[in-house]
A protein has these predicted regions:
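N-terminal Rossmann-like NAD(P)+-binding domain of SDR-like oxidoreductases, especially those catalyzing
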Residues: 1-134
Length: 134
């Protein structure tokens, strides 16, 4: 069997991210997860392993820490990134606009710059239905 490329899933311990990680592993991809656990729990990695029989590579990293993300990319063979990591609570974003700006925009810019620096040509950005409110 030909080895499929390594894929980094940011926000991979969140609901959508973790389900995506399971599907990618089941399709034979080498999957890596970066998540700072601000909206999820590390036990999700254990659940992914229990479901798939494979434990994804994991880093508890804040995407605003560009050098830590760079080091993770240096260690792991990543050829694509699926970006789910973002804050999404509309009400909270009004109360904490700078925190949301840093988390949602600065981290995205870091990833895009790191893609260029590491010759990663495949990038998927996903939003959330919660941005539309209730």
């Amino acid at each position: 069997m030909i080895k499929k490329p390594g894929i980094l899933v940011t926000g991979g311990t969140g609901y959508i991210g973790s389900h995506t990680v399971v599907e990618l592993i089941e399709q034979g991809y080498d999957v890596f997860v970066i998540d700072n656990l601000s909206n999820s729990h590390a036990e999700v990695i254990d659940s992914i392993e229990a479901i798939t029989g494979t434990r994804p590579g994991y880093g508890n990293i804040d995407l605003n820490n560009k050098s830590a993300v760079q080091e993770f990319l240096r260690i792991h063979k990543v050829e694509a990134i699926i970006h789910f990591a973002a804050f999404k609570a509309v009400g909270e974003s009004v109360d904490k606009p700078v925190e949301y700006y840093r988390n949602n925009l600065v981290s995205l810019l870091n990833l895009i710059e790191l893609c260029k620096e590491n010759n990663i040509k495949n990038f998927v950005f996903s939003s959330s239905c919660s941005v539309y409110g209730e």
